[in-house]
């Protein structure tokens, strides 16, 4: 370890970095050096001599961005030098964001049945499916744009667990390799509803242990029906753009959602309730999993009574769904409300792999624009 520290510092000397703060920089060169050295040790980064200078320069820019964001003190979102601190935002978007959908033109309701229900529904102030044995541990998609597959397995794992009382980790690789006919593209992106269609047509999805993840699009589908870990009979599309609808949907289990995760603030998120004013509610590029919601601090409104509920379900063998989803607006305090969101970037990102995303703040980052959950 001491030798590695010495070699890293020696590289800095060889690059002849001056200990002077250039215009536009927020730290001295020695502060950048110390931070980068500690960061490379923490995340076990090793670079070639030709790559070192570029990664160090990117790290400094990200370090400036983090400090500028956090120093404003007007946000509940806390950024940090996480495992993505040595890549540009362009690299990050190209490598890790694999859901491509425009909520304005999305036709996910085509061929689905719409049920309008006039009813009342009282939801609890918070729910967390992790405490009900319906959420598997954090996974890591690696350098593959397969986020959509992790969102799909996550909601399917939850639905299966709540029905059978058995939590089984399901195979993302099965979806990556085999759901091309449903218009998914492996590591180059896909959609959760397309993956649900595959599971329905395929009459199941394999377990993760039988079909392990490789972070590559396989040339051959290796699905084996003897290794099926779960089946679904349909899925519910939640009313687009309504966070109350999403809250109602979350009463049934984890929900697959698409979000705008393109910003530096999401890339470098560390803790707090995430809110990004620049987020788009329609240009969505990342598939994640809502596993619950809650409120930080005092909630003086209590449970919300919802009306004008609408369900959109997948037509499949005369499926009937008794639950309903609302399209009205929330009346709870907004700034401290959050969604509990499971990501697929390992435990080094965010809050041990999770992010708390703003809830009831005009559908920030499009979290309620395209959302659905499977029926086990």
UniProtKB/Swiss-Prot annotation:
Residues 1-18 form the signal peptide. It is found in: Lysosome. It comes from the Eukaryota. GO terms for molecular function: cysteine-type endopeptidase activity. One of its GO terms (biological process) is positive regulation of apoptotic signaling pathway. Belongs to the peptidase C1 family. Cysteine proteinases 1 and 2 are believed to participate in the breakdown of protein during differentiation of Dictyostelium as a response to starvation. This is Cysteine proteinase 2. It comes from Dictyostelium discoideum. The lineage of its organism: Eukaryota, Amoebozoa, Evosea, Eumycetozoa, Dictyostelia.
């Amino acid at each position: 370890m001491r030798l590695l520290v010495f070699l890293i510092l020696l590289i800095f000397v060889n690059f002849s970095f001056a200990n002077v703060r250039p215009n536009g920089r927020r730290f001295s060169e020695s502060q950048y050096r110390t931070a980068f050295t500690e960061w490379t040790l923490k995340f076990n980064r090793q670079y070639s001599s030709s790559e070192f200078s570029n990664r160090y320069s990117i790290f400094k820019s990200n370090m400036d961005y983090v400090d500028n964001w956090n120093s404003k003190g007007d946000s509940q979102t806390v950024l940090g030098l996480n495992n993505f601190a040595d890549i540009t935002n362009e690299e990050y978007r190209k490598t890790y964001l694999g859901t491509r959908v425009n909520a304005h033109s999305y036709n996910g309701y085509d061929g689905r049945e719409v049920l309008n229900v006039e009813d009342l529904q009282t939801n609890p102030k918070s729910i967390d499916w992790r405490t009900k044995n319906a959420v598997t541990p954090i996974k890591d998609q690696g350098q593959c744009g397969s986020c959509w597959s992790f969102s799909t397995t996550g909601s399917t794992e939850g639905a299966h667990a709540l029905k059978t009382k058995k939590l089984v980790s399901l195979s993302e690789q099965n979806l990556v390799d085999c759901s091309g006919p449903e218009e998914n593209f492996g590591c180059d992106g896909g959609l959760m509803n397309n993956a649900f269609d595959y599971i329905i047509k395929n009459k199941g999805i394999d377990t993760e242990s039988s079909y392990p993840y490789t972070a590559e699009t396989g040339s051959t589908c290796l699905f084996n029906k003897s290794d099926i870990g779960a089946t679904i009979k349909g899925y519910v599309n939640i009313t687009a753009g309504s966070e109350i609808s999403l809250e109602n949907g979350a009463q049934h289990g984890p929900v697959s959602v698409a979000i705008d995760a393109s910003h530096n603030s999401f890339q470098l998120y560390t803790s707090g309730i995430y809110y990004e004013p620049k987020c788009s509610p329609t240009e969505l590029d990342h598939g994640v999993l809502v596993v619950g919601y809650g409120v930080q601090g005092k909630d003086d409104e209590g449970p919300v009574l919802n009306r004008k509920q609408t369900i959109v379900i997948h037509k499949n063998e005369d499926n009937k769904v008794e639950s309903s989803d609302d399209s009205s607006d929330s009346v709870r305090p907004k700034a401290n409300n959050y969604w509990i969101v499971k990501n697929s970037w390992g435990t080094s990102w965010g809050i041990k792999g999770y992010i708390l995303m703003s809830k009831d703040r005009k559908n920030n980052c499009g979290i309620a624009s395209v959302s659905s959950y499977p029926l086990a």
